């Protein structure tokens, strides 16, 4: 696992964890905007981006690696943790592993209720069409369609280049493992109730029902959690495509005194 850093490392630390299939650049724009006040750390999960040759194991293993980094490089504590989809689930696990690891946490569109049937369908889809879906030609087409159909959410050229570099080298076994762990089997740990972090849990209005149910379950088990429904949006839109809207929502949360 690699880590990209932005800002002065004497400032409060914020760790932002990308979703499955993407890489550190998922939060690149937010990191740059936050870096004048914070030291922002963007991990590259095993099996993703420049770490594509490393085997992705599980949410728990990823959380352990990030926890070790925080112990070694941040004196065991960060100001905030954040993550989208798989990254948000890793945040949940980190909060469960260490009740006082962070003052704040931002989770976006993450599951904590197992969905084995959905995982089986997703794995079947990847096995049948994965190589076609993530070919360079297909990725170029996806970016063109995004510009045409959703210009507000289109990537800038820099992120397009990262996308075209990283997505075609994503191995199908990595996606299958993610579906088997993130989607099919991960359950919220009882220890989450001991976490002292203040949590903002974001989900899109158009998310699947299981994501909304996960948000409600998390709030039931973690009593210092505020839910936010992003009206009109689908899975992970604020974190992945709309960094300015993400900043408008998250900045007051980060700056608010408890």
Name each model feature, range by range.
Residues 5-52:
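Conserved HGGG/HGGXW glycine-rich cap/lid loop of the alpha/beta-hydrolase fold
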Residues 41-82:
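Active-site loop/oxyanion-hole signature of alpha/beta-hydrolase fold enzymes
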Residues 83-87, 91:
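Gly/Ala-rich beta-loop-alpha elbow adjacent to hydrolase catalytic centers
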Residues 208-214:
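Conserved alpha/beta-hydrolase "acid-adjacent" motif
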Residues 116-118, 136-191:
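Conserved alpha/beta-hydrolase catalytic His-Asp/Glu region
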Residues 195, 201-203:
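Short beta-strand/loop motif that positions the catalytic acidic residue
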Residues 233-245:
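Catalytic histidine-centered segment of alpha/beta-hydrolase-like enzymes
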Residues 96, 104-133:
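Flexible "cap/lid" loop of the alpha/beta hydrolase fold
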């Amino acid at each position: 696992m690699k880590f990209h850093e932005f800002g002065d490392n004497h400032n409060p630390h914020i760790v932002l964890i990308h979703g499955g299939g993407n890489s550190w650049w998922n939060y690149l724009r937010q990191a740059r905007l936050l870096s004048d006040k914070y030291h922002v750390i963007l991990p590259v999960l095993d099996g993703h981006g420049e770490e594509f040759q490393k085997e992705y194991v599980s949410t728990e293993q990823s959380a352990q690696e990030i926890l070790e980094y925080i112990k070694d490089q941040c004196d065991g504590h960060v100001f905030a943790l954040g993550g989208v989809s798989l990254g948000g689930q890793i945040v949940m696990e980190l909060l469960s592993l260490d009740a006082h690891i962070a003052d704040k946490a931002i989770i976006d569109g993450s599951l904590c209720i197992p969905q084995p049937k959905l995982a089986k369908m997703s794995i079947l889809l990847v096995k049948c069409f994965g190589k076609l879906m993530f070919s360079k030609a297909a990725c170029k087409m996806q970016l063109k369609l995004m510009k045409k159909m959703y210009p507000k959410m289109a990537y800038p050229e820099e992120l397009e280049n990262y996308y075209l570099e990283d997505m075609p080298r994503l191995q199908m076994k990595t996606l299958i493992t993610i579906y088997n762990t993130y989607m099919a089997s991960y359950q919220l740990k009882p220890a989450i109730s001991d976490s002292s972090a203040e949590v903002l849990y974001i989900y899109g209005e158009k998310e699947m029902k299981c994501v909304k149910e996960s948000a409600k379950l998390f709030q039931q088990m973690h009593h210092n959690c505020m839910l936010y429904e992003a009206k009109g949006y689908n899975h992970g839109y604020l974190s992945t495509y709309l960094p300015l809207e993400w900043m408008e929502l998250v900045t007051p949360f980060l700056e608010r005194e408890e």
